[in-house]
């Protein structure tokens, strides 16, 4: 009788354990029923303030390809209309970009102005102008390293050696590379063709599509301190040139 009782208890224990395991298997998480196979991890930038888009440039010869400049997440490239993006600026000295421009004469030549064109406290600064001649595979710093914030780059539609750069200049200090810069040798040297003062930079430029010698430049006088922000001073204004920046 004692042997029978022991065997019965052993059988009941095994049955209870098997039932418990079955119950655990049947208890599934609600998300287990959702297919997540199509989702993949992706980088959204190295900083808390990432995600701000500074500029976008679309390849005029291939509308599936474009470049996205972010304020604190580098530069991204897509070759399939945005289905997938690849970071192409992560190995450079600046992760903040203010603008991206494709050479209208050669879509493999890309220009990047580092340092976002923004005046808020969490603004990220850059270290000048970068150029790629292989569609973003490699980069060279072309100068204007103390500009810190660049708003726009324009390449002459008929002459790739002529480039204009709108340099806003440092936000937290005076001086630096600020104003409208022009290069006539593909970015090897730069000439400041519109210099207002040590607190005023050029935030944007537009070229007349009918005449590349005609450009409009907007200037912005601003300075941020720990305790306040001063912006829109007398140096701010709108300028026009009809001779490619000579006057």
Regions found by a protein language model. Name each.
Residues 1-24:
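Bacterial Sec-dependent N-terminal signal peptides
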Residues 21-247:
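Beta-propeller blade termini and top-face loops
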């Amino acid at each position: 009788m004692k042997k029978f009782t022991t065997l019965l208890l052993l059988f009941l224990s095994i049955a209870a354990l098997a039932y418990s395991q079955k119950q655990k298997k049947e208890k599934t998480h609600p998300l287990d029923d959702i297919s997540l196979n199509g989702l993949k991890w992706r980088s959204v930038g190295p900083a808390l303030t990432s995600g701000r888009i500074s500029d976008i440039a679309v390849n005029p010869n291939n509308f599936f390809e474009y470049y996205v400049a972010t304020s604190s997440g580098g530069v991204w490239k897509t070759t399939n209309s945005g289905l997938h993006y690849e970071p192409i600026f992560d190995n450079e000295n600046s992760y903040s970009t203010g603008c991206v421009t494709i050479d209208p004469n050669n879509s493999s030549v890309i220009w990047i102005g580092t340092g976002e064109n923004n005046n808020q406290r969490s603004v990220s600064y850059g270290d000048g102008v970068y150029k790629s001649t292989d569609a973003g595979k490699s980069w060279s710093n072309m100068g204007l390293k103390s500009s810190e914030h660049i708003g726009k780059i324009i390449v002459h539609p008929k002459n790739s050696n002529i480039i204009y750069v709108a340099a806003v200049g440092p936000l937290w200090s005076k001086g630096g590379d600020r104003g409208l810069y022009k290069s006539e040798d593909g970015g090897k040297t730069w000439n400041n063709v519109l210099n207002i003062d040590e607190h005023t930079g050029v935030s944007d430029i537009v070229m007349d599509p009918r005449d590349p010698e005609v450009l409009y430049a907007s200037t912005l006088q601003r300075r941020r301190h720990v305790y306040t922000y001063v912006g829109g001073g007398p140096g701010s204004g709108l300028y026009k040139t009809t001779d490619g920046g000579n006057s």
